[in-house]
């Protein structure tokens, strides 16, 4: 019932909410699409949203804001020049302007660089002339720098900086080794909504090169006020956020960053946040003591450090985006709170990690490091197929695959080298079939605390972010649990971890192998914190500040199991991403998750599956299921098919699967594949009689393959398509159980939390 003139504007603290904002800055919001992960996906844009996240950039000109946005989106670009477009002819560029896809803005930029007139571009794209003029200005600046031929004037340099060009970009384009001004630092302006007409209370800043530094003035005023009041000077800590939400690095890391800030503030520190994602709580103007809305790259961070002069920084809560800054922080001498940069590198570098395992006497799958196709083929021969292939320094299994044949190795090396900077090698590991487990631990440099061991329902080979995850682990022996706890402690001590560490294990035939170690927060930290009642980020930050786990009241070693089961089920957005194979693999594809909690495993699983959108149908008179599975999965699908048959389903299978099921006494009807003549599997899918599709194939990814087209067709028709044996088992067991959500008792998660 309040009127706008009765509500105070929180930003200024002086004007009321009916005061019209006056802005002296321009904001660009740029989408983050998942096409760097899904190389075969259709990149066409339309009325269906396909972005998984976004970045926001603020500048005192459109050009500067746009350059910041391109740097923030983490595509490995520092200007709007996209290398594939440089190789096209003018006619091909004009033809590509008609394509509405995620790369269109880069195509327009290339057209402007080539001198293609604005009228032609406008007629094709209908992009406003104002934007074309601004992008033309950027293109002219870039071309001007490229013509320097090793001689860069002060005026050219300052103009380029004003419009958003980074030092490394200017050096590369102008072909110079030294700049006219070394350490030319940006100033910071305040986001105040009133164009500096009133003094604002919000410590919310963006960088500019126009000579002003309102952040420095704000800091000096605050420090003078504190000194006048006799308050001690607080320790300043820089906290790096995780940038745009994308598959593999989502809102979980914002949870960690925000909880880190809250704990720092509660323990007498000034928490200064750096992030560029407008969707997050970390970029609310009142979360940290100060907020810098700028790209998370070394130069932007150096500018902030020059103004703030922090005492330390925290990199372990911002995902891989923040971890990539650790080495730079180490080089410039800014102390890192928690695990040191060298330990982070030791966990990521294959050779150093192998040496670490030798020292800890911990087994792992045999692996090799390769830089090109010849080395990859030789390594695959030496280790033996199948092999797990992935670039180093990735999160979310980006460009990660299991190669079953030499042809797979050749195809995937082509994909990886196209999308990943080959300064870092490709890692090949022997693929071990077994149960995958995951541990998040808190360490204080000596002792460690494991809130709980998580077990993945899907076996190794399916990315942990796409697997159904269960706490506490259901199928581990006490000896295996003891080994996991022992190995985690060895890693924590040997790496000198202070804060959080995530370790993934494969358990096969009673033997525990390590898959990877990440000395940082992981996407399971919010999940395990909530279901165990152990505030992991809070304890980790306190460890970073010098406290000991033994004094925090949660004990050390493995925390006692909760008296219920919590199941985390992934959620996918395949209906929005055309051309993406829905089959699970080592590359993460899920865009979210839900949680099911119940007194036992099956009830928790049922709640989780229903929450994730799985439908539980009662078979009608003509209801059927389709099976088309790879040879290695056929033995395990016999039992699944028999259970569905006993429920009343009619079974259909492609030739090989049908023959296998009939041979093992499960009646099944053959259906022609998608490339076969009608009536075929497509007609059956469109009949409306199919309740479930079970499809696993040895080959995937390529949208032209029958198996991929089948799974895509099922998604388009909203038919549940199960692509992993273990998920199929879980679903069928829930279908056959007589449990109902109405009969499952509620678990009040809020009762887990109690102050220690």
What kind of region is each of these model predictions?
Residues 160-163, 169, 173:
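Extended, domain-scale alpha-helical bundle/helix-rich regions
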Residues 69, 191-362, 371-378, 597-755:
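ATP-binding N-terminal substructure of ATP-dependent carboxylate-amine bond-forming enzymes
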């Amino acid at each position: 019932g309040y009127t706008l003139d009765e509500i105070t504007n929180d930003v200024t603290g002086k004007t009321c909410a009916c005061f019209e904002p006056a802005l002296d800055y321009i904001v660009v919001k740029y989408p983050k699409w998942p096409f760097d992960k899904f190389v075969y996906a259709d990149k066409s844009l339309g009325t269906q949203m396909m972005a998984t996240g976004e970045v926001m950039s603020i500048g005192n000109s459109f050009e500067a804001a746009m350059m910041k946005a391109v740097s923030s989106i983490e595509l490995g670009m520092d200007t709007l020049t996209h290398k594939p477009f440089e190789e096209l002819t003018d006619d091909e560029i004009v033809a590509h302007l008609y394509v509405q896809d995620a790369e269109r803005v880069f195509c327009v930029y290339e057209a402007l660089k080539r001198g293609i007139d604005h009228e032609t571009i406008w007629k094709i794209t209908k992009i406003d002339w104002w934007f074309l003029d601004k992008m033309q200005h950027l293109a002219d600046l870039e071309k001007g720098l490229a013509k320097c031929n090793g001689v860069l004037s002060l005026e050219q340099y300052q103009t380029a900086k004003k419009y958003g060009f980074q030092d490394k970009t200017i050096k590369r384009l102008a072909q110079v080794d030294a700049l006219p001004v070394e350490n030319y630092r940006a100033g910071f302006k305040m986001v105040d909504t009133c164009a500096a007409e009133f003094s604002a209370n919000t410590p919310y800043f963006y960088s500019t090169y126009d000579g002003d530094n309102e952040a420095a003035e704000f800091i000096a005023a605050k420090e003078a006020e504190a000194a006048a009041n006799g308050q001690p000077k607080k320790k300043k800590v820089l906290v790096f956020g995780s940038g745009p939400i994308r598959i593999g690095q989502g809102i979980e890391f914002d949870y960690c960053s925000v909880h880190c800030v809250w704990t720092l503030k509660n323990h007498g520190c000034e928490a200064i946040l750096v992030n560029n994602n407008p969707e997050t709580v970390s970029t609310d103007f009142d979360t940290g003591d100060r907020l810098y809305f700028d790209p998370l790259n070394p130069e932007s961070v150096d500018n902030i450090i020059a103004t703030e002069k922090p005492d330390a920084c925290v990199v372990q809560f911002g995902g891989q985006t923040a971890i990539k800054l650790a080495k730079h922080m180490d080089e410039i001498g800014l102390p890192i709170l928690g695990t040191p940069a060298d330990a982070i590198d030791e966990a990521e570098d294959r050779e150093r990690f192998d040496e670490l395992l030798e020292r800890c006497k911990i087994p792992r799958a045999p692996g090799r490091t390769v830089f090109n196709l010849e080395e990859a083929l030789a390594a695959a021969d030496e280790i033996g197929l199948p092999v797990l292939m992935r670039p180093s320094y990735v999160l979310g299994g980006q460009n990660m695959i299991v190669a079953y044949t030499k042809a797979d190795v050749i195809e995937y090396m082509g994909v990886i080298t196209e999308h990943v900077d080959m300064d870092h090698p490709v890692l090949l590991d022997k693929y071990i079939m077994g149960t995958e487990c995951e541990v998040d631990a808190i360490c204080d440099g000596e002792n460690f605390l494991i809130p709980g061991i998580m077990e993945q329902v899907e076996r190794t080979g399916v990315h942990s972010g796409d697997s159904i995850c269960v706490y506490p682990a259901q199928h581990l022996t006490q000896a295996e649990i003891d080994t996991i706890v022992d190995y985690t402690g060895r890693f924590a001590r040997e790496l000198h971890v202070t804060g959080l560490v995530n370790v993934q294990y494969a358990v096969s035939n009673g033997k525990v192998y390590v898959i990877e170690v990440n000395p940082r927060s992981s996407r399971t930290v919010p999940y395990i914190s909530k279901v165990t009642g152990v505030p992991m980020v809070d304890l980790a930050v306190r460890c970073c500040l010098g406290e000991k786990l033994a004094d925090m009241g949660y004990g050390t070693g493995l925390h006692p199991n909760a008296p219920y089961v919590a199941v985390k089920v992934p959620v996918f957005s395949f209906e929005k991403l055309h051309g993406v194979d829905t089959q699970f693999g080592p590359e993460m594809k899920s865009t979210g998750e839900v949680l099911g909690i119940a007194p036992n495993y099956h009830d928790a699983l049922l709640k989780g599956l229903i929450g994730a959108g799985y439908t539980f149908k009662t078979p009608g008179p003509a209801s059927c299921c389709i099976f088309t599975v790879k040879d290695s999965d056929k033995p395990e699908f016999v039992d699944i098919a028999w259970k569905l048959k006993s429920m009343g389903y009619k079974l259909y299978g492609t030739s090989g699967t049908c023959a296998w099921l009939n041979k093992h006494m499960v009646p099944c009807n053959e259906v022609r594949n998608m490339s076969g003549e009608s009536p075929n599997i497509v007609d059956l899918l469109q009949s409306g009689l199919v309740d479930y599709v079970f499809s696993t194939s040895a080959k995937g990814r390529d949208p032209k393959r029958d198996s991929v087209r089948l799974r895509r067709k099922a998604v388009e028709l909203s038919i549940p398509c199960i692509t992993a044996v273990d998920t199929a088992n879980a679903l069928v067991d829930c279908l056959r159980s007589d449990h109902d959500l109405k009969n499952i008792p509620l678990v009040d998660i809020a009762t887990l939390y109690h102050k220690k």
